[in-house]
C-alpha cells in the first residue's frame, strides 16, 4: 500500500504541469502528504484548517513521502518536531514554517488556487523556497548532518526509553533521504510501514485512540443538563487541568485549602492560555474572557 501510494504521489510531484493543493479543513496524515506532493500549497485561514503528520501518535510513520518532502520544504530542524511529535499547526503558522506557500480567506480557496495554477503555468508565479536556517544549511553537509541526527536520536531515546519504534524509523527514513536521495528515502518508508502497522505497539495505540474517542461520546440514556458553573475541589495537577479545559465552556470555581496550590494552579492555567494564544488556537481577547471566568478560593 505504501509503495503504491508513494508511486502515485511521485507522479504528481514530477508532473510537467503545475499541481496546486487547496487546503480547507483538516489535512492530517495522508491528506498533508498529498498536498506536499503538489507544486504549490494554499491553505485557508479558517479555524478548522489544521495540518500535521500525527501517525507517530499511533505508532506509525508517515508512509506517503512526508519524511522526505516535509524535510525538503522546511528543512531538518523544522520537519523533525512535526514528524516526531505529531504536532498539528494552523494555516498561518504553517505559512511561517514554510509548509504552505500562501494563506487565503475560506471563501476564496478554490478561486485563488485556480489563479495560482494559471500563474505557475505561464511563469508569472514561482514558488519561493523557504529560507533555511544556518543549521539546516549545515545539515546538508555530511559531518554536521550526522551531529544533528545523532542529537535527535539521543533525544528520542531519552523520551521513549526505547519502547516506541516509530520515531526511530522516522529518523532513519529522514537520514536515508538526506544521504541517498528522495527515491531511497521513499523506499525506506515503505519497508518500515508494514512491520509497524501490524506491530503490538501500533495496535495498542490505535486501540487506545478509539477507546478515548468512545469515552468522549455522551451517554445514550438520560437528558443532559446545561452546566452554568463548574466547581473543582483541589487545585493540584488534575484539578488545574480540569479547570483549564473547562474555562471555555462555563465559569469555573477552584477551591483548595492551600494558597500555594491555588497560586500554582493559576500559573498553570495562565501558561496554558498563553500557549493557546501563541499557537493561534484562540485570540488574546478570548484568552482574557476565559481567564475572567476563573475563580480561585479557599
Question: Which role fits each region the language model picked out?
Answer:
Residues 222-248:
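Glycine-rich adenosine-cofactor-binding loop
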Amino acid at each position: 500500500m505504501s509503495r503504491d501510494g508513494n508511486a502515485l504521489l511521485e507522479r504528481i510531484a514530477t508532473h510537467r504541469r503545475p499541481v496546486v493543493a487547496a487546503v480547507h479543513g483538516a489535512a492530517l496524515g495522508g491528506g498533508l502528504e498529498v498536498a506536499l506532493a503538489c507544486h504549490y500549497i494554499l491553505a485557508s485561514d479558517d479555524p478548522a484548517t489544521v495540518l500535521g503528520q500525527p501517525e507517530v501518535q499511533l505508532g506509525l510513520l508517515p508512509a506517503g513521502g512526508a519524511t522526505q518532502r516535509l524535510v525538503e520544504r522546511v528543512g531538518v530542524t523544522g520537519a523533525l518536531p512535526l514528524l516526531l511529535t505529531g504536532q498539528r499547526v494552523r494555516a498561518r503558522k504553517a505559512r511561517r514554517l514554510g509548509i504552505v506557500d500562501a494563506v487565503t480567506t475560506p471563501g476564496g480557496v478554490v478561486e485563488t488556487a485556480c489563479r495560482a495554477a494559471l500563474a505557475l503555468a505561464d511563469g508569472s508565479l514561482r514558488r519561493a523556497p523557504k529560507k533555511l536556517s544556518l543549521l539546516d544549511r549545515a545539515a546538508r553537509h555530511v559531518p554536521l548532518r550526522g551531529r544533528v541526527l545523532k542529537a535527535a536520536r539521543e533525544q528520542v531515546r531519552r523520551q521513549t526509553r526505547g519502547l516506541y519504534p516509530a520515531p526511530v524509523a522516522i529518523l532513519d527514513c529522514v537520514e536515508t533521504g538526506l544521504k541517498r536521495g528522495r527515491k531511497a528515502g521513499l523506499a525506506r518508508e515503505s519497508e518500515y510501514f508494514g512491520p509497524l502497522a501490524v506491530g503490538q505497539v501500533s495496535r495498542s495505540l490505535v486501540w487506545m485512540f478509539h477507546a478515548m474517542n468512545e469515552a468522549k461520546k455522551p451517554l445514550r440514556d438520560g437528558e443532559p443538563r446545561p452546566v452554568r458553573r463548574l466547581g473543582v475541589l483541589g487545585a493540584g495537577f488534575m484539578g488545574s487541568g480540569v479547570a483549564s479545559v473547562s474555562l471555555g465552556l462555563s465559569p469555573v470555581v477552584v477551591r483548595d485549602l492551600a494558597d500555594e496550590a491555588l497560586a500554582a494552579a493559576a500559573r498553570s492555567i495562565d501558561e496554558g492560555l498563553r500557549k493557546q494564544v501563541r499557537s493561534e488556537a484562540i485570540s488574546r481577547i478570548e484568552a482574557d474572557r476565559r481567564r475572567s471566568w476563573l475563580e480561585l478560593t479557599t
